[in-house]
Amino acid sequence: MLFACLRALHYEPKRMRITVISGDPRRTEKTLRVHAVSRFDGYSVLKRVYQSDLLSSGGGSLLQDVTSWKSMMYYLSIIGMGIFFRKKVFLYSQGIGPVRYHWGRWILRTVMNHVDAITVRDSESKFFLEQLGVKNRIYYTADAVLSLSPVPHDIGREILRKNHIPTNKKLIGISIRRWMNTEV
């Protein structure tokens, strides 16, 4: 997801300085050639938000409380820091909701009404925010992952060959991930 977001920004390490909040900063820096701070280092996160010109949150489904209300509050607190420090705050390709708790919906609405731009990746998220009473304009966009270019055909065919997948018929690839209470 982060790779897709960087590609959408046309990220060039020599032209831009991007700092990422990461669970594994060293790996993130090495893999994606960005600066990274640990999500568990509150001081570094606060410092980087303060030093930034723009705070971008997303993509993914960060603003929901089904996984944990604590997770949603963590991400809202980072967005809140950006608002407090008067930075431009942009929600990029977010999946938002569900939010089960009334107080969580109130906090989410309050924060969303103070960001500079909101883009969501599905109609349910847009509808949820509108029903919540978010007054900011909400833009509907594709999931950031859809902005990635496919691998060249010869590399794709080699991957299929190595995995003994026939190439003489039409194929579709689907990446499945467990989500909320679904069974896969």
Which residues are covered by each model-predicted region?
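Active-site anion-handling motifs in enzyme catalytic cores
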Residues: 1-184
